[in-house]
UniProtKB/Swiss-Prot annotation:
Organism: Haemophilus influenzae (strain ATCC 51907 / DSM 11121 / KW20 / Rd)
Enzymatic reactions: an S-(2-hydroxyacyl)glutathione + H2O = a 2-hydroxy carboxylate + glutathione + H(+)
CDD domains: hydroxyacylglutathione_hydrolase_MBL-fold (cd07723)
Keyword Oxidoreductase: no
Function: Thiolesterase that catalyzes the hydrolysis of S-D-lactoyl-glutathione to form glutathione and D-lactic acid.
Protein name: Hydroxyacylglutathione hydrolase
The protein's required cofactors: Zn(2+)
Length: 238
């Protein structure tokens, strides 16, 4: 089971569960909707994963810990002050029922991480559909390196970003694909139509796949740091 629970203005809380096992929660932007959903599902929780320190991913931690004090909350070092109980900057997390790869994807924040669980990539604000996160650290090399790590994963990887930014990202992608192939242009246009339909029905545009992102995401297509940096700076003022 994979479910994107809308939160705040455009966040998603991702919930992942193998059949008949406790679930994993990715990021805690808020808790009211989450607690209602968990109660309705009569869910048990294996762990919480925090991708980075920003408030719109962590401001629900305090309330969550009061209600579920024994559930481990994993996150990078920067999330310790936000309430993470288990610090993970890279490597693997082994819980009772899951093996989780921790992939460094800094740049948006210094210690941002992404989590890979059963071919599901929970990438926070590192990678979006047709886009990537702003480089608030100013370290474009760190951001580019993190995206390159994600770009080595298989095509069938299911990509679960933390925000509903897809339409705006596709609009930018269309402006920078003028020199791209007809196949790539067609993929962007086709995805834009799909996303417009989804959003008109108040449905998520996500998840996506790494195969699709390789076709429509200019930041994954960037071959050099210089190309990536120019794209990101252009998107900042788009």
């Amino acid at each position: 089971m994979l479910f994107a629970l809308p939160a705040l203005n455009d966040n998603y809380i991702w919930l992942y569960q193998r059949e008949n096992l406790p679930l994993i929660i990715v990021d805690l932007p808020e808790t009211d909707k989450l607690f209602a959903w968990l109660e309705k599902q009569n869910a048990t929780i294996e762990a919480v994963l925090l991708t980075h320190e920003h408030d719109d991913h962590t401001q629900g931690v305090s309330a969550f810990k009061k209600r579920y004090p024994t559930v481990p909350i994993y996150g990078p070092q920067e999330c310790e002050k936000k309430g993470a109980t288990q610090i993970v900057n890279e490597g693997k997390i082994l819980t009772a029922n899951y093996q989780i790869d921790v992939i460094p994807t800094g740049g948006h924040t210094k210690q941002h991480v992404s989590f890979l669980v059963d071919n599901h990539l929970f990438c926070g604000d590192a990678l979006f559909s047709a886009g990537c996160g702003r480089v608030f650290t100013g370290n474009y090399a760190l951001m580019f390196e993190g995206l390159q790590r994600l770009n080595t994963l298989p095509d069938e990887t299911i990509v679960c970003p933390a925000h509903e930014y897809t339409l705006g990202n596709l609009a930018f992608a269309e402006t920078v694909l003028v020199d791209k192939s007809a196949v790539e242009k067609s993929a962007v246009e086709k995805q834009r139509i799909f996303v417009e339909t989804q959003r008109a029905e108040n449905k998520p545009s996500l998840p996506t796949t790494l195969k699709l992102e390789r076709e429509i995401n200019p930041f994954l297509q960037a071959k050099t740091l210089e190309e990536f940096t120019a794209l990101r700076k252009a998107k900042d003022i788009f």
